[in-house]
Amino acid sequence: MPAGDLTRLVAAALALAAGVAAVVIVALLLSHTPGPVSTAAAAPAAAASQAPVAATPHVPIPAAFPAPPANAVVFARADGSNVLALAAGPRGRRLLLQASVLGPQGKGVRGLDVSFTVRQRSAHAAACGAGCYRALLPVDGQPRAVLVDVRGRSAKTRWRVALPHRWPAADGSALMARAGRVWRSLRTLSFRERLASDATHSVTSVWRAAAPDRIAYTVTKGYSSVVIGGRRWDRAPGGRWVESSQTAPIHQPVPFWVSVANAHVLDSVRLRGHDVWRVSFFDPGTPGWFEAAIDKRTLHTLELSMFATAHFMHDVYSGFDKPAGIRPPG
């Protein structure tokens, strides 16, 4: 993972845990626009040992991170302050199932009791590493859904996951590559973001980005910033704009994912008047699980969800190549 992205995730998690007073750290780092904030908190995570990911061997992730098996279809959700993810893939007449449980410190959660049920057949999962629980389940015909049952000392979660209507699911790698190129070709982009670290702590913000080096955001009941090239302006709630130097160059608009593995088309749906593909994938570079809604006509990413270490994000995108109006504050 690039150092800037690692710092972004760690600082975001710490800021959310600290509360609204620290929300400026979240906003600055989520934008890929480093500002005048401390990054010392990122050091422990950066020192984590590394291990290759089978699906993308050139992208290392922490050894204690429960990455999905290669080629499996992936799903993810928040479960308290943890990420709960499912990977499913055909293995002949059996179904390979893996639950990944990622804790808020970026390591897999051990010692859980996990089972899977498909069409009234159940299997107990065996541990396959930190936060990794895996089973092979015989299936007759096409599997429609998986029931994931996770039990721990103080928690119990039952999660029903609908599988793609087409099985095996269609590969989405080429589609995500095209969507990434379209994103990088945009002149402007706007989006609304909700970022949470658990069920209690969350912030909402509105963003505008313009090529090649302009971005502006406003956090609900929080900070605002404008970045233009090498200058930035920041404003605390109820305060005045303060001008300073932008400490690192930025390039916008760019996708939030770093790399793509395990990409599959989940289904086709209608979203806000657009025909879209829903695509899920794992990003070893973040690392985290993503789901994107891709417009079939334009290949614009209309919505994006991400589940990473203490970092649960949902973005809704609009204003593609529309005037963004990013100027120095008056």
Where in this protein do the model-derived segments appear?
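Gly/Pro-enriched, hydrophobic low-complexity segments
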Residues: R194, A216, H274-G330
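Short amphipathic beta-strand segments in non-cytosolic proteins
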Residues: S115-A125
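An acidic-aromatic
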Residues: T200-V254, F312-M313, Y317
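Beta-strand-rich domain onsets/edges
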Residues: L30-S31, G35-A46, Q50-Q98, L102-R110, ...
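N-terminal leader/targeting segments and the immediate start of mature chains
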Residues: P36-A48, P52-T56, P164-P212, R327-G330
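Flexible, processing/modification-adjacent segments and terminal tails
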Residues: A170-L175, I228-G285, P329-G330
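Aromatic sugar-binding surface patches on proteins
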Residues: C128-A135
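Edge beta-strands of extracellular beta-sandwich domains
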Residues: A155-R166
